[in-house]
């Protein structure tokens, strides 16, 4: 009798499985892929967070991270070996310097931008902000700290995650997630500050995208290869999936976010980036995407990018 019950159980499971959407064969993905050589892994920094890397004009690699301030390191051999880390920004009392970004301008100037984050208990003189430092000698020496933007002094009304882009005109742009304008709710926009003198002085922040009731965040800008458009990839939790979704917002280089233009919720220049045709819902794609984001948030907490929910 027990054997018969087991046979019926396997039969029912087989029938059920055969009717599930994910049981059907999917056409193999034929697009491009990237394979990483895990044997090439090298340690650049130890016990740090939010590392970024670029190739400099002289062929060196330069990395930056947060670790009790902001640290940098260089490689002379395309990343096979790395020099000792150098701290270029120290944490002031009651403030953590976080989430650095770096860029080398066409004239060779290197700029590192970062995000001062006050620790609790909060006080009005310690604000969440964006700052930067410049080097005109290949990273050997660095300028004094340069002011870019301030939000408020509380975690709920801060600013976050700077990312930079240089335009062909020489204009330097710094994008960041910005809660400062929304003190009465939990909304967040992407803001932009501009520099016309290589990062020495900066304009006031302007809005470039915002979805009411949602939290546009984590901007990374690029100029398309044909130099026709500025595209900024963000995370957007307003698509109705119950979590953040990779999204692009864009403008033409000619417009360049001028004439009070910004991308709202219904603007055709706001686009989702994932194509579920390659990973149908039935295969668990959305669940996996959600899980990956949750895992990223856990990693963020572990590496001290932020000890509170993602922005």
Q: What is each PLM-predicted segment?
A:
Residues 1-6:
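N-terminal secretory signal peptides that target proteins for export/translocation
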Residues 8-16:
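Sec-dependent N-terminal signal peptides
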Residues 16-23:
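C-terminal segment of classical bacterial N-terminal signal peptides
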Residues 98-99, 157-165, 217-218, 281:
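Extracytoplasmic beta-rich repeat domains
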């Amino acid at each position: 009798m027990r054997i018969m019950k087991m046979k019926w159980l396997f039969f029912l499971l087989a029938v059920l499985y055969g009717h599930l959407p994910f049981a059907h064969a999917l056409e193999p993905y034929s697009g491009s892929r990237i394979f990483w050589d895990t044997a090439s892994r090298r340690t650049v920094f130890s016990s740090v967070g939010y590392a970024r890397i670029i190739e400099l004009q002289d062929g060196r690699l330069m990395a930056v991270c947060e670790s009790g301030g902001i640290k940098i390191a260089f490689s002379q051999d395309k990343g096979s070996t790395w020099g000792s880390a150098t701290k270029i920004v120290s944490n002031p009392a009651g403030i953590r310097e976080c989430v650095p970004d770096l860029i080398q301008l066409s004239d060779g100037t290197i700029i590192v931008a970062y995000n001062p984050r006050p620790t609790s208990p909060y006080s009005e003189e310690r604000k969440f902000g964006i700052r930067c430092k410049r080097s005109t000698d290949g990273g050997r020496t660095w300028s004094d700290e340069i002011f870019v933007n301030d939000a408020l002094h509380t975690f709920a009304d801060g600013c976050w995650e700077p990312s930079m882009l240089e335009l062909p005109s020489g204009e330097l742009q710094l994008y960041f997630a910005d809660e400062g304008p929304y003190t009465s709710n939990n909304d967040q926009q992407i803001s932009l500050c501009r520099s016309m003198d290589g990062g020495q002085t900066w304009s006031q922040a302007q809005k470039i995208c915002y979805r009411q009731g949602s939290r546009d965040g984590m901007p990374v800008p690029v100029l398309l290869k044909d130099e026709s458009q500025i595209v900024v990839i963000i995370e957007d939790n307003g698509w109705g999936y119950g979590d953040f979704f990779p999204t692009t917002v864009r403008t033409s280089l000619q417009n360049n976010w001028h004439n009070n233009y910004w991308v709202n919720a219904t603007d055709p220049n706001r686009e989702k980036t994932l194509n579920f045709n390659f990973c149908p819902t039935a295969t668990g794609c959305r669940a996996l995407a959600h899980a990956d984001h949750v895992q990223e948030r856990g990693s963020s907490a572990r590496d001290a990018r932020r000890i509170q929910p993602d922005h």
